[in-house]
């Protein structure tokens, strides 16, 4: 009878990566004692005789602890040593033939990279599939098979709908720094990856038992940045919580670290100050860890593409400290290079709030979104925008905010539209970028409810624009005559709204046009 398999911590051996002074046998046994649940023995450039001898020793260790032992590729070696099964690649023996040779009780896994390979493996009788490559790895060249978290999630979404039991294991480039992110962000339709396959993390460790324990704990524990869905389920509930949230700014000034484009820096800094935040625009890779130590948030407004390494590092550092990260994927879809960079960012870090205009969000949601430079060209119905925002929020397990004449905001559970604002916001440079700054402030004070944070920021921003165009001088004349006069009055009104709220005057909230999308 075929045994039940725990794929959680899947160790792939490598005799070329053994920690100094250790042996492959010691690394495997210590790894098992620390929590390894399955061992796959892989050898390269070694004689069959040596392969069999080493495999026998490892097989005995695995039997001692009742841990399944698989052989990579070699059906003959698996038979010779009495292994529990094999793992085969796309260029190895066909899975159906391997099943015929090894029998129904053998454990057979297949390396896969796409849905077609998944379907074939299942049809051929595979027990599980190794899915990847998730990231690049030093153990082999996988550049032509990289799928990232985005690709892994699409595959798991497909597997969740298959009418068969098929184990899933993520492979390539995985270690203690990224496995929680991969597990959390790849989950689809309730289907979570069954296991994480690692090589160097354990084989290179001088303390493999402790390393395996740490890895098992990480696999079983949600990441610190995991986002709970809002408990507020109606517009009234949300609006009632805004005053209490903004009151926190009376005694707390969050540091809002911006990695933004040059044209937005000045305005974003002024808006951050008006919103009771403290702006910093440091762009050095070496500074981001120090900035993240201060309570606040990170705003990634994608400007210079050459700063990708810094963007990723900054997001990951803030993820590790559970600091909110706001991503503004500026002009994604406008150029191939920009889309590639933003896709990389999505695969290497978590973002609490993704905000953008219609074109940007529709592109990320997999829909056609027209861009004219950094500007969006509206072409979708409100219903289509609501659907796209909700879907993207579900996929990325975050809050998504689409700005426009009507704003759409969702946490994947509840979706809302906001019908406040003035068209002059669209006629000044960096108005969208600076909304991200306000979201950074509100996310810092709404740590447990990023939906409330995004809605609060958007209402503040939009209502401030309405009040600005209504402002009059002592003679009764309108102060705002166009985009140029709008900017300073808008910044003033934004500051006044928060200041009045702190004092207890919340009449402005009555202007909110917040509706729940059906």
From Swiss-Prot:
GO BP term, example: thiamine biosynthetic process
One matching Pfam family: TMP-TENI
Pathway involvement of the protein, from the record: Cofactor biosynthesis; thiamine diphosphate biosynthesis; 4-methyl-5-(2-phosphoethyl)-thiazole from 5-(2-hydroxyethyl)-4-methylthiazole: step 1/1; Cofactor biosynthesis; thiamine diphosphate biosynthesis; thiamine phosphate from 4-amino-2-methyl-5-diphosphomethylpyrimidine and 4-methyl-5-(2-phosphoethyl)-thiazole: step 1/1
Positions bound to 4-amino-2-methyl-5-(diphosphooxymethyl)pyrimidine: 40-44, 72, 111, 140
Molecular functions per Gene Ontology: ATP binding; hydroxyethylthiazole kinase activity; magnesium ion binding; thiamine-phosphate diphosphorylase activity
Keyword ATP-binding: yes
Region of interest (Thiamine-phosphate synthase), ranges: 1-229
Database matches in Gene3D superfamilies: 3.40.1190.20, Aldolase class I
Keyword annotations: ATP-binding, Kinase, Magnesium, Metal-binding, Multifunctional enzyme, Nucleotide-binding, Thiamine biosynthesis, Transferase
Annotated positions binding 5-(2-hydroxyethyl)-4-methylthiazole: 281, 430
EC number(s) from the headed UniProt entry: 2.5.1.3, 2.7.1.50
Annotated positions binding Mg(2+): 73, 92
Residues binding ATP: 355, 403
Family that this chain belongs to: In the N-terminal section; belongs to the thiamine-phosphate synthase family. In the C-terminal section; belongs to the Thz kinase family.
Cross-referenced PANTHER family: THIAMINE BIOSYNTHETIC BIFUNCTIONAL ENZYME, THIAMINE-PHOSPHATE PYROPHOSPHORYLASE
HAMAP family linked: Thz_kinase, TMP_synthase
Stated name of the protein: Probable thiamine biosynthetic bifunctional enzyme
């Amino acid at each position: 009878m075929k045994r039940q398999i725990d794929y959680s911590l899947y160790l792939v051996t490598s005799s070329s990566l053994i920690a100094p002074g250790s042996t492959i046998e010691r690394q495997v046994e210590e790894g098992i004692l620390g929590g390894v649940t399955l061992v796959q023995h892989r050898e390269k450039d070694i004689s069959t005789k040596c392969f069999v001898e080493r495999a026998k020793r490892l097989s005995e260790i695995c039997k001692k602890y009742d841990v399944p032992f698989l052989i990579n590729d070699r059906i003959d070696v698996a038979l010779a040593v009495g292994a529990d099964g094999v793992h085969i690649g796309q260029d190895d023996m066909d899975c159906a033939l391997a099943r015929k040779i090894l029998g129904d009780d053998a454990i057979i896994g297949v390396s896969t990279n796409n849905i077609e390979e998944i379907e074939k493996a299942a049809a051929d009788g595979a027990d599980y599939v190794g899915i990847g490559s998730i990231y690049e790895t030093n153990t082999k060249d996988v550049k032509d098979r990289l799928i990232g978290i985005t690709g892994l999630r699409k595959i798991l979404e497909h597997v969740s709908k298959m009418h068969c039991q098929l184990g899933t294991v993520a492979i390539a480039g995985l270690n203690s720094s990224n496995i929680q992110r991969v597990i959390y962000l790849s989950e689809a339709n309730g289907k979570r990856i069954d296991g994480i396959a690692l090589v160097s993390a354990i084989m290179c460790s001088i303390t493999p038992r402790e390393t395996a324990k740490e890895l098992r704990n990480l696999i079983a524990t949600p990441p610190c940045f995991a986002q709970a869905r809002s408990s507020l389920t109606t517009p009234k509930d949300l609006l009632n919580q805004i005053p209490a949230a903004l009151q926190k700014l009376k005694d707390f000034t969050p540091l809002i670290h911006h990695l933004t484009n040059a044209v937005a820096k000045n305005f974003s800094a002024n808006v951050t100050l008006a919103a009771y935040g403290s702006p910093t625009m440091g762009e050095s890779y070496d500074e981001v860890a120090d900035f993240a130590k201060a309570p606040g948030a990170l705003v990634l407004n994608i400007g210079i593409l050459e700063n990708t390494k810094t963007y990723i590092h900054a997001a990951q550092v803030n993820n590790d400290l559970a600091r909110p990260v706001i991503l503004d994927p500026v002009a994604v879809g406008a150029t191939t290079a920009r889309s590639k960079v933003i896709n990389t960012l999505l695969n290497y870090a978590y973002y609490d709030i993704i905000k953008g205009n219609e074109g940007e969000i529709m592109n990320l949601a997999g829909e056609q979104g027209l861009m004219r430079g950094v500007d969006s060209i509206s072409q979708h119905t409100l219903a289509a925008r609501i659907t796209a925002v909700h879907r993207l929020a579900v996929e990325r397990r975050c809050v998504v905010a689409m700005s426009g004449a009507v704003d759409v905001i969702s946490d994947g559970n509840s979706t809302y539209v906001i019908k406040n604002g003035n068209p002059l916001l669209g006629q000044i440079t960096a108005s969208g970028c600076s909304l991200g700054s306000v979201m950074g402030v509100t996310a810092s004070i709404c740590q447990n409810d990023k939906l409330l944070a995004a809605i609060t920021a958007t209402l503040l921003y939009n209502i401030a624009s309405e009040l600005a165009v209504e402002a009059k001088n002592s003679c009764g004349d309108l102060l705002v005559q166009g985009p140029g006069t709008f900017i300073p009055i808008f910044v003033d009104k934004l500051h006044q709204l928060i200041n009045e709220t702190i004092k207890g005057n919340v009449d402005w909230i009555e202007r909110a046009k917040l509706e729940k999308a059906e």
